[in-house]
Curated annotation (Swiss-Prot):
Keyword Transferase: no
ANK repeats mapped onto the chain: 446-477, 478-509, 513-542, 547-577, 581-610, 614-644, 648-678, 683-711, 717-746, 750-779, 783-812, 816-846, 850-879, 883-912, 916-945, 959-991, 992-1019, 1023-1052, 1056-1085, 1089-1119, 1125-1154, 1158-1187
Species of origin: Latrodectus hasselti (Redback spider)
Note: Is the main neurotoxin responsible for the human envenomation syndrome known as latrodectism that results from bites by Latrodectus species.
GO CC terms of this entry: extracellular region; host cell presynaptic membrane; membrane; other organism cell membrane
Protein name in UniProt: Alpha-latrotoxin-Lh1a
Keyword Calcium included in the entry's annotation: no
Length: 1351
């Protein structure tokens, strides 16, 4: 790594090298993000020049140390320099970029710019997140076919990112030159969409066409990596388009502002062509044979998402796929929704020019002898055309302000009109509306007069033009009017005239950036105009759109004292108004200088300690600006809090220390109110910490000598200034600390001493300095590490040798049981290893707590020289750690043939295996290292693959299997087709491991095709269970389709009478089932349990498959079919307690009364299983309850029906009714013969009467409850049945669904059984209450009808 390759002690790293160094420590992206995000946070900071980058860097540097503690290892890696230096550089570039973007956009380009910035933000955000991971993908892909394609994607993406960043921070002139280079980056990126070999499009389409990005199984690591590369490349492709649009838009706008309309047209045209070309590539042309890249990538994503082998919800792949599908769909919609970037038609210049107005020259730009030309541009909503050619020149002679006559545009577009005198810069002079044919060129001249610095001439011309009809409300660049122009020039006579021509509210008219005339006047220092506008009642506190600045902010920033005074005369002025970032006008006044500050300080309402959103006060800014006169002016108020802290708890002194301002630091320290030991939050860093951290030795030395500075103050993690001085290699500061008696054994919270830090640092010379001061070289950290440990484990060879020369203890062990020799081995420090072994050779085979010897650690890291040295010194070549890993296994896994040969020659045990039984040969096979496989096969005197391998006996339980068996199995399982081919041709025996079956099991279609098509293997194999059985069981649809299309028998027995479809059903592979169903499966075939595929689906709880089979009615499936035990699907669903399946079967009409071989219905089984939910559901859906009780109690126990009339005639209902209501156990008797002949019906009106009657006659004997249980059940059933008849008569399905009949029956039975007969009436009535819509008189009629119908 770079950390190890860099010469120790070398300090002059470039910024790029530092960035690379810290990238290894995973810091780089954080700093880049800080640099980007700070722009928004401090966008309106009232400080200019490079100081902006400096303050931003200083403010955000606290992030480097605030995430919990100052990361010692990151800082020691040199990264402490990166936050400050790099953030400043990033910010300077970003501010250059912002300066370019703040230039006014032409109206034609504003919408394009918005679209590009919006879209590129979404794409680039996720692309940056993928960037680092893509490096890992690149390193791990070694496939000969795929690697070149992925490498092309990587090379292009890196070039794109590098060039984009390289031009980003250029100054305007350099930026333009770079973009306009012949055959430069714009041309190269445009060609990225062509099929050229070095383009980006070529590898992307190759990956898609060859299906390299479609995994064949969950273990298809290569395909998943290629998929990642495809997504990364596609997002890069989209980013390239938006980058090009951004640059061509910028160039067009640049030349528009310069007035070079020919160049404007050229880049405007390029802008549209780029969009249309990329649009065609990305979303196609709309024809079926021309799909765009996005559609093809989306198809790949959907294919992967729908792969049945993916346990998507469990491994996070599903979330990633959905995110990318949504992103690409969003981009596609965005691009498709934009037909083109510009109007395709370039307008013809039909202008006929005549001087009809009596306006004589000279006036404004109109001077005799000049020539004037006009050009036009179409504008339609957000689309604009190119600008037309210039009209023929017309000489100016005595008259000005001509009339242009143009035909009305038939498509009703507006027309922008441009004017150019001689070779001067063109100007937009107006806009012609769709129905307007005449245009008088006068409004722009009125606007220009207001800008005339000669106020007398300007006013005279203004009066003339206004009199001749010029429009004072006409708008020009950035939406500015004549009011803005007069405010900027300070022409008070014109402004006075304007105030009499319009209402006061029009004087508040903002331009496109929110600047009103009073903003412009304040920013220009035109106090008289400000005063005039205030008198006319304009809004004094109005704010600009972007930064929310008031006129007072602008005047303060410019230092315009008189303008400030005029503004302050308004009683409505808010002197403490905040801008977007919370800065008040006083903050801005820091830039304006001492005079404007004094004016502010004298105001009663001023808040001298006002804080911005980030907590910065004006005093902070003065110190950051290193402007002591301004700071002194603020201090003169006697009200400034010199210890005020920002959001990171940083004072002005912190910033002075960070920025290295020695004289300002001295001034601050001399203030009696200063607290020099305030610490930042949460890093707890003092000003002294920061001075050392940022290597300002003069400031640090001054603070160390200051009496009111605590030199031993601890930051978060227990880091003192001494620790930082060591980390940063500040020898001068260390000497001073030694002189003033600082304790050199100070420890951090993790017990790092200065010597520990020196041993890890890039300043090894500090080690001897500390040792000379008496530092304890045997001190240990919390993890048990000595300085020598840290030197070796951090790869610091020079530091380790210095310590060894001072006779430190080389046998100390840390918490992992490791000695310094282990660290030297792990980091390839040959010289250190030699030095230790020369002192003590016994450490050669010392094992740590993981049983790793130095040799094993060196092998794991591939440090060849160290390995050979250890072996030459007699190290155990067959050493194994706790997981069984040995040197030979490590190199075979990595594919290092030379080292495998070396270890063979050194008589390593070639049959040594890890704890999983994997030897070097299996590792070579599994990782596709054919060269090692061939070498091993050639070394027959050392390695014989026909030997029995008992290390993997559990994988081959029925017999002893040879290495060859496991090797073939591994080659197939891990989809190493080249090794499979080698084995097959070498062995000439297809029986070993059954490669055809194994390929089907793991879904490796290419291997399957090779064996069938090139080796002529029978698709049904030679075993009872066919390859189709394996493929179906494991859900490999593509393999299933291939086998069937090549004649595989779909009804072949897979064992136990099961076929391929049964296998697919058992694992719930719906797509496989659907395919097999369409290709001749016998659905009537039964397995050994007598179950058809349908019954198997139910018993396996494969709901989707069961529903599919029923819905599709495959081969007239009988939903009531029974297995050998006469059980239906309903029985099976009840056994498995699958209520969802039960509801499905009931929905499709299964017979719930069928009894199995044990005379049980499904309801009986549910009852036996005591599953109340299923019992209640089946009871509710079983229709007439009578069927249930016939089987339980026999026909005799049911109530016999008869006509109601005999009962009605024989009883006085009205007379008996009160007694019925109170009837209970006391008056109950056995059910009489008379009652047994009553027809118990359930009309709504008679429910009450019937229940009273039953109550009076009695159902239950007081003498014997158990003896009457059958009768009670029958009575409850009869009542419930008649109640159900009532519900059925309503012809209201929703009403019937609201009543749970099983619940009603249960409650009625309970009431009867307990003798609470009077409760039956409210039970039934409460069930009816929610659905009854009949009034009492309607119920009486209904009862009468029903009674008559039963008579």
């Amino acid at each position: 790594s770079l950390v190890r390759m860099r010469r120790e002690g070398e300090e002059d790293l470039t910024l790029e090298e530092k960035a690379e160094l810290c990238s290894e420590l995973e810091l780089q992206q954080k700093y880049v993000d800080i640099g980007s995000n700070i722009i928004g946070d401090l966008s309106s900071l009232p400080i200019v020049g490079k100081i902006v980058g400096t303050i931003a860097a200083a403010a955000m540097a606290v992030t480097h140390v605030a995430s919990g503690r100052l990361d010692i290892e990151q800082t020691l890696g040199g990264c402490s320099d990166v936050p400050f230096d790099q953030i400043k550089e990033i910010l300077e570039e970003r501010f250059n970029e912002i300066d370019r973007k703040l230039e006014s956009h032409s109206a034609a380009l504003e919408e394009i710019t918005k679209l590009v910035e919006k879209s590129i933000s979404a794409v680039e955000k996720t692309r940056k997140q993928m960037n680092k991971r893509f490096d890992e993908v690149m390193r791990s892909i070694q496939d000969a076919k795929v690697s070149p394609l992925v490498s092309k994607i990587n090379n292009f993406a890196r070039y794109f990112d590098t060039e984009k960043e390289r031009i980003r921070g250029l100054k305007l002139s350099d930026y333009i030159l770079k973009l306009e280079e012949p055959n430069g980056i714009l041309l190269h990126f445009k060609e990225s969409r062509t099929p050229r070999d070095d383009s980006l499009q070529a590898p992307l389409f190759s990956i898609i066409q060859e299906r390299y990005a479609v995994p064949k199984s969950i273990d298809d690591e290569l395909a998943f990596k290629v998929l990642y590369a495809l997504l990364y490349g596609t997002q890069t492709y989209v980013s390239v388009m938006f980058f090009l649009l951004e640059q061509y838009s910028f160039l067009a706008n640049h030349y528009y502002e310069k007035g070079d309309l020919e160049k404007y047209d050229e880049y405007f045209n390029s802008l549209n062509n780029v969009f249309l070309d990329f649009k065609s590539s990305l979303v196609g042309t709309g024809t079926s044979n021309n799909e765009g890249l996005l559609d093809r990538v989306l198809q790949v994503l959907v294919t992967v998402k729908n792969s049945e082998f993916l346990g998507l919800e469990k491994n996070g792949v599903n979330e990633m796929l959905n995110e990318k599908i949504n992103l690409f769909n969003k981009i596609k919609v965005e691009i498709e929704g934009k037909q083109r970037m510009t109007l395709s038609e370039t307008p013809e210049n039909f202008a006929q020019i005549s001087f009809d107005k009596d306006i004589t020259t000279p006036i404004g730009d109109w001077r005799d002898g000049r020539e004037v030309r006009y050009a036009v541009q179409y504008a339609s909503e957000t689309l604009f055309s190119k600008i037309s050619h210039w009209s023929d020149p017309v000489g100016v002679r005595e008259k000005a302000c001509p009339t242009l006559r143009m035909p009305v545009d038939q498509t009703r577009r507006n027309i922008l009109v441009f004017r150019k005198f001689d070779s001067s810069k063109p100007q937009l002079v107006g806009e012609i509306t769709p129905y307007q044919s005449n245009f008088i060129d006068i409004d722009r001249d009125l606007y220009n007069t207001a800008n005339n610095p000669d106020s007398a001439v300007g006013f005279k011309e203004f009066t003339k033009l206004n009199y001749d009809g010029a429009n004072i409300r006409a708008t020009f660049e950035q939406g500015r009017t004549v009011f803005h122009a007069a405010a900027k020039s300070g022409n008070s006579r014109i402004m006075i005239g304007l105030t009499f021509l319009v209402k006061s509210n029009e004087l508040n008219q903002p331009d496109k950036k929110g600047y009103t005339p009073i903003h412009v006047a304040a920013d220009s220092g035109n106090a008289g105009i400000v005063n005039l506008l205030i008198q006319r009642g304009v809004s004094i506190n109005s704010k600009t759109y972007n930064f929310l600045q008031t006129p007072l902010h602008l005047a303060a920033q410019r230092g315009f004292v008189t303008t400030f005074q005029r503004l302050m005369e308004s009683p409505e002025i808010n002197i403490n108004e905040r801008d977007k970032d919370g800065f008040t006008p006083l903050h801005y006044a820091v830039r304006g200088g001492e005079r404007i500050l004094e004016a502010f300080i004298n105001q009663i309402r001023i808040d001298l300690n006002a804080k911005s959103n980030k907590g910065l006060t004006p005093f902070h800014l003065a110190i950051i600006k290193d402007d002591w006169p301004v700071a002194s002016t603020l201090l003169g108020s006697k009200k400034v809090d010199v210890n005020a802290v920002d959001e990171n708890n940083m004072t002005a002194l912190h910033y002075a220390a960070i920025l290295g301002y020695l004289e300002t630091t001295k001034q601050l320290i001399n203030l009696k109110e200063i607290n020099a030991d305030v610490v930042s939050s949460p890093g707890l860093l003092s000003a002294l910490h920061y001075a050392i951290l940022y290597k300002h030795d003069d400031v640090a030395s001054f603070l160390l000598r200051s009496s009111n500075v605590n030199v031993n103050l601890k930051a978060l993690g227990g880091i003192t200034p001494l620790h930082l001085a060591v980390i940063q290699g500040r020898t001068q500061i260390l000497s001073l600390m030694f002189d003033i008696g600082v304790n050199i054994e100070q420890q951090t919270d993790e017990k790092y001493t200065p010597l520990h830090l020196a041993a890890m640092s890039k300043y090894p010379e500090l080690i001897q300095i500390l040792l000379d001061q008496g530092s304890n070289f045997e001190a240990k950290t919390n993890s048990g590490a000595t300085p020598l440990h840290l030197a070796t484990f951090k790869g610091k060879s020079k530091a380790a040798l210095i310590l060894l020369n001072n006779e430190v203890n080389w046998r100390d062990t840390d918490e992992n049981g490791q000695m310094p020799i282990h660290g030297a081995a792990m980091n390839g420090l040959l010289d250190v290893a030699q030095a230790i072994i020369s002192i003590d050779a016994t450490v050669l085979d010392i094992k740590d707590k993981n049983s790793d010897t130095p040799l094993n650690l060196a092998a794991q890291k591939s440090h060849i020289d160290v390995i050979k040295y250890f072996i030459d010194q007699g190290a155990d070549i067959n050493t194994r750690n706790k997981t069984g890993h040995a040197p030979l296994l490590a190199f075979s896994k990595k594919g290092n043939l030379d080292m495998v040969k070396y270890l063979f020659d050194k008589n390593a045990n070639v049959y040594i295996a890890d704890n999983d039984g994997i030897n070097f040969f299996y590792y070579a096979v599994r990782n596709g290292h054919l060269n090692i496989v061939k070498y091993a096969m050639s070394e027959k005197d050392k390695f014989e693959w026909s030997n029995i391998d008992n290390n993997r006996r559990d994988e081959c339980p029925k017999e002893e299997c040879a290495i060859s068996h496991f090797a073939v199995c591994d080659a197939v399982q891990f989809d190493k087709i080249e090794i499979v081919k080698y084995f097959v041709t070498t062995l000439g025996n297809f029986a070993i491991c059954g490669p055809l079956h194994q390929a089907a099991r793991y879904g490796h279609l290419d291997i399957e095709k090779y064996l069938v098509e090139e080796e002529d293997l029978n698709v049904d194999g030679s075993k009872p269970d066919t390859p189709l059985c394996y493929a179906s069981e494991n859900g490999h649809l593509a393999v299933v389709q291939y086998l069937v299309s090549n004649g595989a028998k779909v009804n072949h027995d897979c064992g136990n009478g099961m076929t391929a479809i049964d296998k697919a059903i058992t694992k719930n592979h719906l797509q496989v089932v659907q395919f097999l169903a369409a290709n001749g499966v016998d659905f009537r075939r039964k397995n050994k349990l007598g179950a058809t595929p349908f019954l198997t689906a139910v018993s396996e709880n494969a709901f989707d498959i069961a529903e599919y089979l029923i819905r599709e009615n495959r081969q007239d499936i009988d939903i009531n079919e029974q297995n050998v035990d006469k059980e239906t699907a309903l029985h099976l669903a009840v056994y498995y307690k699958n209520l969802q399946m039960i509801k499905l079967l009931v929905k499709y009409g299964i017979d719930m009364t069928i009894r199995n071989a044990y005379d049980k219905t499904a309801l009986d089984i549910a009852t036996d299983l005591k599953n109340s939910n299923i019992v209640e559901y089946l009871k509710t859906k079983s229709g007439k309850f009578r069927r249930e009780y016939k089987s339980s109690y026999g026909e005799h126990s049911l109530l016999q029906t008869n006509k109601i009339s005999s009962f009605i005639d024989g009883k006085n209902i009205e007379h008996d009714h009160p007694q019925f209501i109170n009837a209970d156990n006391e008056s109950s008797q056995l059910f009489s013969d008379t009652a047994s002949n009553i027809d118990v019906i359930g009309p709504l009106l008679l429910i009450d009467v019937l229940i009273r009657y039953f109550s009076k006659q009695g159902y239950i004997s007081k003498e014997s409850d158990s003896a009457s249980d059958g009768i009670t059940q029958a009575a409850a059933l009869s009542i419930t049945e008649k109640f159900e008849d009532v519900l059925n008569s309503l012809h209201n399905e929703s009403a019937k669904e609201q009543v749970d009949l099983a619940e009603v029956h249960g409650k009625v039975y309970a009431a009867l059984k307990s003798g609470r007969n009077s409760q039956i009436h409210p039970i039934l009535c409460s069930s009816l209450k929610s659905i009854s819509t009949l009034k009492p008189e309607d119920m009486e009629k209904l009862g009468s009808v029903i009674m008559n119908s039963h008579s």
